[in-house]
């Protein structure tokens, strides 16, 4: 079957003396026409531009699932696919069936929540419409224009994932599209360091750094638009004792599942419950509880934390006290308390002290990632292996890999 050449650019950091700038490197992938159609369709869905793309007979979930199945098959064929420290093993967390089943809801959630976020950068579709066929019809329809649009869309997607995003669902939808294209790319003309595993490592490290740096809230959230939500949360937040500040997410999620034993949990949940009722009415999702945990973790938890009195914003460093260390709880940012809540939620079997240790590790890892992203053009896979060993993360990685996607309610 005939294949076509797809050219696309990826962005890299470059430091020359004291000057920092971005460099774009061009890559070449070989694809069949059906793959180009599928990826053009999916990237247009990602950027909400599908009304300007003329591709008939495709459905979002079917095409996205094909993409995931192809990636998983290639990962599993690799000789180191079972290596716990390998990038493909880590990326496999985004490819599980439990996660994929939730993808149809992701677009619905992102569409509803866009009121609270700044718009993302998108490619200029009309710039890629040829005068002969596409521009008269107002839609991209010919293969050449599809390739040109897809090339620009991949470059825009790559830059957007590096710069940060509105909600964590966006990179979880976007990264598999880039991984698929990278897996189809010929690296024979590139230096040895530029290879499939290292490009995926670069992508994951940037994703993780953006999560840890709170870019979603600090750079992409319309905080003015969120003020009514914060005000609603402020009415009930004092029902949460300050000592339970790091358990808020766990308590709210348990109450969503009618499993909370906390006396004030029903009242504490009310702002989020009202928000989800309105969301269900607007989106026509019949079982809104299926997406409740996702919206809570990805968006609404932060509204609760922003409503907290200042004395609630304390970390758990006091739990690290020993005979050589008289640490006390310290003031922390809303972002750190949010991270503390997420860690407490994910690592359910950990003691509070163990969770505090994980958070301290993550703060140190953030600095290491920042340095490698600034000073290295490409982050090699060996960086992840070293971080896992240096910070003794085997247990945490194992728990994440074994996690049955509790963060995505499957009821």
Curated annotation (Swiss-Prot):
It comes from the Viruses. Belongs to the baculoviridae p48 family. Pfam families: Baculo_p48. Keywords: Late protein. It comes from Orgyia pseudotsugata multicapsid polyhedrosis virus. This is p48 protein.
